[in-house]
Amino acid sequence: MSKLILIRHAKSDWSGNVNDLQRGLNKRGYNSCRVISKELKKRINKPDLFLISPALRAKLTYENIFLNWDDKDNNLFVEEDLYNASLEQIEKKLASKVLGFSTVVIIGHNPILNLLMYELTTNGHNKLPTNLVT
């Protein structure tokens, strides 16, 4: 693996009475996905492995950033433990899944993405806001 891209899900919709896993995106979330998609297309080829939280907002973030790219052949894995994983679980998942892939995307949640970013780099952001790509 030469690139690891961490994406916190886009801004979620808090209207309605739905459980946390079923919350979708709000208007701001959809808009930021369009911006992120355009910017990523300028900088990288389409990633060849996606590890995504089972939360609806994470799945919608993936769909709205990557599904309009030209290449439709994805290695997409919805990983149940990305919803409430520990740093150790994420590191084990990366070690077991990423061999043979050049660019891997994880779409998930804080605080774990923030912890992983700090574990892998010393120049990370202080806080990972929604839909930040690092």
Where are these regions (language model features)?
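A glycine-rich beta-strand to alpha-helix segment
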Residues: 101-120
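Short phosphate-binding loop-to-helix
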Residues: 81-99
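Domain-level recognition of soluble alpha/beta enzyme cores
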Residues: 124-134
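Active-site-proximal alpha-helix that buttresses catalytic centers in soluble enzyme cores
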Residues: 2-81, 85, 113, 132
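Glycine-rich phosphate-binding loop signature in dinucleotide/nucleotide-binding domains
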Residues: 43-46, 96-102
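Glycine-rich, phosphate-binding/catalytic loops in enzymes
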Residues: 23-24, 67-69, 95, 121-125
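Short, conserved acidic/polar surface loops in the N-terminal third of protein domains
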Residues: 62-63, 87-91, 116-119
